Amino acid sequence: MEFKHQTVLLQEAISGLNVQNNGIYVDCTLGRAGHSLEILKHLPNGKLYCFEQDEAAIVVSEEILQKSKYRNYEIIKNNFVNLAAELQLRNVKAVNGILYDLGVSSPQLDDDKRGFSYRYDSPLDMRMNQHQGLTAKTVVNTYSQEALVKLFQDYGEEPFAKVIAKTIVIARNEQEIVTTFHLVEIIKKSLPQKILKKAKHPAKRVFQALRIEVNQELFVLQESLRQATTLLAVHGRLVVISFHSLEDRIVKKYFQSLTKDPNYEINQQLPAISYFESDYHIITKKVIVSSVTEQTNNHRSRSAKLRILERVK
């Protein structure tokens, strides 16, 4: 199967990075190299480090980059939670920009063997790194009913989490749940007809929750962002593209925490002025979203949100 991937918010992300031609940059989510290629166009005398843990993506991106004229890059085959450690191994102490393009890519969704999509009948896998142990099949068949409820509520914001979890437990007691379509069928049985008639696919929230759990996406994001901000050089930029509210909330709150006076509540009660000056500045006071044209051409860009942080001292 041939997979197509359209890079989301490409020019907005590159503009946000404010690429210096001799700088050091990191693409934490190489994918199909869309953002990386664009960064390299602006980086004739610098270096780009590209993180990717998905072997299928690495094979494709290596081929794409090898066909380009650029050689000032290195692909790091690791999860971006290991950002600081991998750069330390390369004696990189500070960088001028870091980019995250979060979530599952179009080729991953369209791969009928990976289990990311509820639109294809495939094994319940959902691993970004196919060498890790935990799969969606393990979660669905071994987690307690209470754990599944919490998972669907916290990571999927699923209003019918309780009844879906209960139906899953009943179903797996009769037969192990091993495919995406089997799980979709169980979810549909759990929901009222008025929900099934809505445009949004009834399994969307549950699949999101399972994917986040399998790949520990929210923990990994929080930990990697913490490392990223400490690695930024003065005037370095951190650009993050997210695709659902849980990710965007983490990014937004983390950026705010870096720029807000830690004694804000105390200072509010005092007549004196606060002398707090943050090391960071939020460039995007208003989140950047895809244009109407991009949304028309690539429907997966509709949920994309881009935020930018700059280190100022």
From Swiss-Prot:
S-adenosyl-L-methionine binds at residues 33-35, 52, 80, 101, 108. It catalyses: cytidine(1402) in 16S rRNA + S-adenosyl-L-methionine = N(4)-methylcytidine(1402) in 16S rRNA + S-adenosyl-L-homocysteine + H(+). GO terms for biological process: rRNA base methylation. It comes from the Bacteria. GO terms for molecular function: rRNA (cytosine-N4-)-methyltransferase activity. GO terms for cellular component: cytoplasm. It is an enzyme of class 2 (transferase). This is Ribosomal RNA small subunit methyltransferase H. It comes from Spiroplasma kunkelii.
